[in-house]
Curated annotation (Swiss-Prot):
Organism lineage string: Bacteria, Pseudomonadati, Pseudomonadota, Gammaproteobacteria, Thiotrichales
The protein's assembly and partners: Monomer. Can also form homodimers and oligomers.
Cofactor annotation comment: Magnesium is required for nucleotidyltransferase activity.
Residues at which CTP binds: G8, R11, R91, R137, R140
Primary gene name: cca
Keywords: ATP-binding, Hydrolase, Magnesium, Metal-binding, Multifunctional enzyme, Nickel, Nucleotide-binding, Nucleotidyltransferase, RNA repair, RNA-binding, Transferase, tRNA processing
InterPro entries: CCA_bact, HD/PDEase_dom, HD_domain, NT_sf, PolA_pol_head_dom, PolyA_RNA-bd, tRNA_CCA-adding_enzyme
Reaction catalyzed: a tRNA precursor + 2 CTP + ATP = a tRNA with a 3' CCA end + 3 diphosphate; a tRNA with a 3' CCA end + 2 CTP + ATP = a tRNA with a 3' CCACCA end + 3 diphosphate
Name of the protein: Multifunctional CCA protein
Function, in words: Catalyzes the addition and repair of the essential 3'-terminal CCA sequence in tRNAs without using a nucleic acid template. Adds these three nucleotides in the order of C, C, and A to the tRNA nucleotide-73, using CTP and ATP as substrates and producing inorganic pyrophosphate. tRNA 3'-terminal CCA addition is required both for tRNA processing and repair. Also involved in tRNA surveillance by mediating tandem CCA addition to generate a CCACCA at the 3' terminus of unstable tRNAs. While stable tRNAs receive only 3'-terminal CCA, unstable tRNAs are marked with CCACCA and rapidly degraded.
Gene Ontology MF term list: ATP binding; CCA tRNA nucleotidyltransferase activity; cyclic-nucleotide phosphodiesterase activity; magnesium ion binding; phosphatase activity; tRNA binding
Length: 416
């Protein structure tokens, strides 16, 4: 019975990336052997055990054989005769198919160290094509490791294209897709995830509303970077630089979906794309069972990012009507959820900076809207009640007072 550290922990250690999770493979053992040593079994489909002290996962070495569609369609075999090499060959990429023994020696039967040195993402074997989730996993690894200069091996890209063409991606469950999206959004350059999916023809299958942004022209004055797809990818990466919040990054990803609906005859303008995009965001969220809180936030960013930008004109002067300022503040729950409103403004800032030549420009709208919300929320409720208003009149009086406070602040801001 031998135990090996495997997978991501070995890869990340060789890349000098902090290792947070350790996965182990046990060769030459039975489930009974593990239980007798105090491990507790958690796996149903195949034996995975938790270490009695560290609670890290230890899996018996196993082989897999395709027996049906999707990533559930596998027959798993595990017994003491399964070798480490047998276990490693079923893994997705060569850089994930390395192990380390108890003495610290690297076991690398499939060239993972060479591919690490060459910065190549390469599949271990043709069995890669048996699991459609690997298309998403490899795209995610490309995003995670892009800062190190990793690229996709041409033969792996070709295999992923054939997987897209096979129809197997439709067998993926919404939860697994969303899980990979979240992991990709948490990388430094999440755009790479979607660009790889596009490269292997998976984007149009999994995210058609994003695919529809390709080639959609925008006003060159405001968007010298190119079409709505290029802009969206730049906004996504800008959001990653500004915030670690998945909600902000997801909102950045979907904020301009409405531009994909604009008739070509109206290009490069996209009047009303904000509101038009909301049903597309809702549909995507429902398709992949995105948590409701993230969906609602993304819908708010999608619907109101245009008005947030136009809160100040190009000279930095307040630009909306008082009633519109209040409408945006109320709709975005700026009075009740201050932290969430600030996150919404960060998503809008990413939108403004996700343009060629605008990456380092200040975004005064953020501080303006935060101060506007603070001022408009400084309503003296007791003073209003002291006037004797009752029932529905109280709400109306609060609205009028907020309008007055907004007007005062706008006047003050304009005089600066």
């Amino acid at each position: 019975m031998k135990t090996y550290l495997v997978g991501g922990a070995v890869r990340d250690a060789l890349l000098n990336i902090p290792v947070y999770d350790h996965d182990w493979v046990v060769v030459g053992a039975t489930p009974q052997d593990m239980l007798e040593q105090g491990f507790s079994q958690v796996g149903k489909d195949f034996p995975v055990f938790l270490h009695p002290k560290t609670k890290e996962e230890y899996a018996l070495a196993r082989t897999e054989r395709k027996s049906g569609q999707g990533y559930h369609g596998f027959e798993v075999s595990f017994d003491p005769t399964v070798t480490l090499e047998d276990d490693l060959i079923r893994r997705d990429l060569t850089i994930n198919a390395m192990a380390q023994d108890a003495e610290g020696q690297i076991v690398d039967p499939y060239g993972g160290q060479q591919d690490l040195a060459d910065k190549v993402l390469r599949h271990v074997s043709e069995a890669f094509a048996e699991d459609p989730l690997r298309v998403l996993r490899v795209a995610r690894f490309a995003a995670k490791l892009s800062a190190f200069g990793f690229t996709l091996a041409p033969e792996t890209a070709a295999l992923m294209k054939s997987m897209s063409a096979s129809g197997e991606l439709s067998a993926l469950t919404p939860e697994r897709v969303w899980q990979e999206v979240v992991k990709a959004l948490n990388t430094q350059t999440p755009s790479v995830f979607f660009e790889v999916l596009d490269h292997v023809n998976a984007l149009s299958i999994l995210f058609p509303a994003l695919d529809a942004l390709k080639g959609v022209q925008q006003p060159e004055k405001h968007h010298p970077e190119g079409d709505a797809w290029v802009h969206t990818m730049m906004v996504l990466d800008a959001s990653a630089a500004l915030s670690n919040d998945v909600s902000v990054r997801f909102a950045a990803l979907v904020h301009d979906l409405g531009k994909g609906l604009t008739p070509k005859a109206l290009w490069p303008k996209h009047h009303g794309h904000e509101k038009a995009g909301v049903p597309l965001v809702a549909a995507l969220c429902q398709q992949y069972r995105v948590p409701k809180k993230i969906q609602i936030f993304a819908e708010k960013v999608t619907e109101y990012h245009g008005l947030i930008h136009r809160g100040l004109d190009l000279e930095g002067h307040p630009h909306l009507k008082t009633a519109t300022f209040l409408k945006v503040l109320s709709a975005c729950q700026a009075f009740k959820e201050v932290a969430q409103f600030e996150s919404l403004l960060i998503a809008c800032e990413a939108d403004a900076k996700g343009r060629l030549g605008f990456e380092s420009r200040p975004y005064p709208q953020k501080d303006f809207w935060l101060e506007l919300a603070k001022r408009a929320n400084a309503v003296d409720n007791q003073a209003i009640l002291a006037t004797g208003v009752k029932g529905a009149e109280i709400g109306e009086a609060i609205v009028q007072e907020r309008m007055r406070l907004i007007e005062d602040f706008v006047r003050e801001y304009s005089a600066i």
